[in-house]
Amino acid sequence: MAMQREAGVQDFVLLDQVSMEKFMDNLRKRFQNGSIYTYIGEVCVSMNPYRQMNIYGPETIRKYKGRELFENAPHLFAIADSAYRVLKQRQQDTCILISGESGAGKTEASKIIMKYIAAVTNAQGQNEIERVKNVLIQSNAILETFGNAKTNRNDNSSRFGKYMDIEFDYKADPVGGIITNYLLEKSRVVQQQPGERNFHSFYQLLRGANDNELRQYELQKETGKYHYLNQGSMDILTEKSDYKGTCNAFKTLGFSTDEVQTIWRTIAAVLHLGNVEFQTIEDELVISNKQHLKSTAKLLQVTETELSTALTKRVIAAGGNVMQKDHNATQAEYGKDALAKAIYDRLFTWIISRINRAILFRGSKTQARFNSVIGVLDIYGFEIFDSNSFEQFCINYCNEKLQQLFIELVLKQEQEEYQREGIEWTNIEYFNNKIICDLVEQPHKGIIAIMDEACLSVGKVTDDTLLGAMDKNLSKHPHYTSRQLKPTDKELKHREDFRITHYAGDVIYNINGFIEKNKDTLYQDFKRLLHNSKDANLSEMWPEGAQDIKKTTKRPLTAGTLFQRSMADLVVTLLKKEPFYVRCIKPNDLKSSTVFDEERVEHQVRYLGLLENLRVRRAGFVHRQRYDKFLLRYKMISQYTWPNFRAGSDRDGVRVLIEEKKFAQDVKYGHTKIFIRSPRTLFALEHQRNEMIPHIVTLLQKRVRGWIVRRNFKKMKAAITIVRAYKAYKLRSYVQELANRLRKAKQMRDYGKSIQWPQPPLAGRKVEAKLHRMFDFWRANMILHKYPRSEWPQLRLQIIAATALAGRRPYWGQARRWVGDYLANSQENSGYEAYNGSIKNIRNHPADGETFQQVLFSSFVKKFNHFNKQANRAFIVSDSTIHKLDGIKNKFKDMKRTIKIRELTSISVSPGRDQLIVFHSSKNKDLVFSLESEYTPLKEDRIGEVVGIVCKKYHDLTGTELRVNVTTNISCRLDGKARIITVEAASNVEVPNFRPKEGNIIFEVPAAYCV
């Protein structure tokens, strides 16, 4: 440890007794002495000092650079340096996880870590690396402006989650990075709790911009004039200087003037939008204060009429039809607030993507694979407000996941590894919060799944309904309760509140708004409006607005599900890296630099699991490594193991090395790994290794470098010359041989299709593919030029049908003209008018939501069903489905029997002249048809036409080929039951018909029909 005098112990591991009383006593002494950092091994416990500390200057940075944790007093710089050294020495990705509740100092901790990394890198002073460092530092100012806000507990609270990967090259200099954001609390844009403020950006614009800028945005300095700002606190912080800092950060990150203008115009537009008011006059909804509407439209660069229409009306598209519905005042207010929240959320996401473009590694993908990263996680802390809503629910779930990760990595895995390796160990009990994570995220049973089910339900579903569903499904969960489940609990409001017992304590959530916030609905009208903005940057934020107005949009994933998935992805990312922990603690709720609230601090120590962490650390080991890797890294420091140890196993070699260096008292030998207890031992090993490496490298360079370079150069030069000449020769030979073979292709009947192409050389594989395409294009033109272009669609279908049937059915209508929609023809169908009406009705009111544009084929049929009955029906093939219709007597009524073409598994037909066809469905409900005309059997074969059309559409929809069976014994499934259809010739039959026989089906046809 450093020799300076400090209160208490610098590492909790050194406490003479492990108890909550001793832990708290040490924490209190250090806080009152101004020592805000204390270790638990390699975990840093950070107390928010609520004052400026003079411990972050250049001199302090130099003091911690390249030093081990135990060499200096505890500091965030030491944690940052440890993470950086692991990356530099082992090329191992690392991450620094900063956790703690809101106001505990997480954001400041992340900035201090970033400052240190920027200070200790780029020793050679390269301009590009210096630019990247500045961009990484300055990005924080922008993110705080647009993502942070004043809450009752924290003047600069992050209202979004941030994870930054800083990318380092092989010299361990920063070359780029990428920021991922999580769940911006956008509801704060339109409403704040008493004493809290909106995002800093609004106040910076009003109080920091000059008069000319405010006139340009048609704004006034008084925040009280704006509805979205006057609901909460109007305290003045440091907005004027912060505004200048934000604008300077924009310049540093390379934002153009146009982009910065878009950002501030959008912020101003949200303020004006909040002041738009609605009034109902003679049953008509109107906007009463047109000036704010006009200002909003101007700033968003849309027309006033378009904005007014989007706010007061809604376009509804269904079945290709478009209609407009008027809003009432309540709906208009909801739409306005939803628009304001969405605008700010999209702007924030766009700003982060723009920052990422500035800091993203500019090297090639090949280079990027070899880079290492340090991840810094600064995410919202655990929150308990007077009124806790959907946002607090998501934030606290996020903290549960991070706590679970900490438990998994620090407590659970470490103890399990000791037991697995045979290290003597006394198991330490701890609370595993997996049960709380499951309460939220468990599929089908968790709160998010219950919310999603409620959001997807048909009809009006209220928050009260959702709470009832949660009570029903979670009534027996030990960490969930509500007033309905606990009628005597007066703390909970009836039909409004529910309580979750989190690892950090009980939180009462108000259910009101959960459904709306989870759905996160925004009318398509607003997306179209902003996509059509003349501001190109704003338009870029709304790509969905380009969608056709008639197109019905799919229901997007809910906010809860998206957040759950993002948390799962974050955990996967963190598990790939070696973690370092900073556990932030809030000393009091008064933001005082002197008050140490015992109860408040002890509560945080308990739920963060710091005492359990201490017990594991005291009994555990600072480092462990597989024997083979340990020996590979340190073998050069011992004469007995360098250059290779041949006197036994890797374990024996490690033991020899450790005993020679006199570290045997500080290590334990597991089954597959060595465990080192003290960081001093690891430091000594690293120090000796670092002293040896220059000598080894110099020796190797002296002996080998010159020989390798000369040999490789000669080999490479010779190889390139030979390969280049050989490739050119083989390619010329191939092209000449091909030209000779294809010389008479134009005079051949098949235009050279039967000509065998020569085998291309390896260097000519790509050329061969291009030559094949050129030849196929030429040959197709030679074949098709004698046919009118109007016949090409039928010709294409006939080719598809011929390919599918593969010569297995001699008669398939190849010699006639194919019409397709026969029932729409008056010569084929006396009831064609009724048929056309039925098709129109089906198109406008699809039974299963599957719409279609056109009918590709239609015919009268005789169908056979699972009741062993045949009946006269009709069917159509559309561009997506196969529909069964009633017969002409019932005016072709839709029988609600549909097979989606993409759900077909195959088609079966017979080889004869009969018109039998079976459509096999993946749902085991096949369709069995015999094609007919209205009054008599068909005089022409139409099976080939049906096969060609269905096979083409199936390929269009799925990208794969549909199997076609040609046989007289067809297996099918009618309503799930397996049946066999046998085609039999019958001398006394004039018209084909079906009849049941012993559970199967006989299809009787005239003898002349059989092959």
From Swiss-Prot:
Annotated gene: Myo31DF
Family to which this protein belongs: Belongs to the TRAFAC class myosin-kinesin ATPase superfamily. Myosin family.
PROSITE patterns, sorted: IQ, MYOSIN_MOTOR, TH1
Effect of substituting residue 156 to A: Loss of function in specification of gut left-right asymmetry
Segments forming domain IQ: 694-714, 716-736
Note: Overexpression throughout the embryo reverses the normal left-right asymmetry of the embryonic gut, giving rise to a gut that is a mirror-image of the wild-type. Ectopic expression in the larval epidermis causes dextral twisting of the entire larval body. Ectopic expression in tracheal precursor cells causes dextral spiraling of tracheal branches, giving rise to a spiraling ribbon shape instead of the normal smooth tube.
Protein role: Unconventional myosin that functions as actin-based motor protein with ATPase activity. Binds to membranes enriched in phosphatidylinositol 4-5-bisphosphate, and can glide along actin filaments when anchored to a lipid bilayer. Generates left-right asymmetry at the level of single cells, organs and the whole body via its interaction with the actin cytoskeleton, both in the embryo and the adult. Normal left-right asymmetry of the larval midgut and hindgut requires expression in the embryonic hindgut epithelium during a critical time period, 10 to 12.75 hours after egg laying.
Taxonomic lineage of the native organism: Eukaryota, Metazoa, Ecdysozoa, Arthropoda, Hexapoda
Compartment list: Cytoplasm; Cytoplasm, Cell cortex; Cytoplasm, Cytoskeleton; Cell membrane
Record domain TH1: where: 806-1007
Gene3D superfamilies for this protein: 1.10.10.820, 1.20.5.4820, 1.20.58.530, Kinesin motor domain, Myosin VI head, motor domain, U50 subdomain
GO biological process: actin filament organization; actin filament-based movement; determination of digestive tract left/right asymmetry; determination of left/right symmetry; endocytosis; hindgut development; imaginal disc-derived male genitalia morphogenesis; mesoderm development
The protein's name in its UniProt record: Unconventional myosin ID
Membrane topology type: Peripheral membrane protein
Organism: Drosophila melanogaster (Fruit fly)
Subunit structure: Binds to F-actin. Interacts with arm. Interacts with shg. Interacts with ds (via intracellular region).
Domain Myosin motor: residue ranges: 7-690
Entry keyword set: Actin-binding, ATP-binding, Calmodulin-binding, Cell junction, Cell membrane, Cell projection, Cytoplasm, Cytoskeleton, Developmental protein, Lipid-binding, Membrane, Motor protein, Myosin, Nucleotide-binding, Repeat
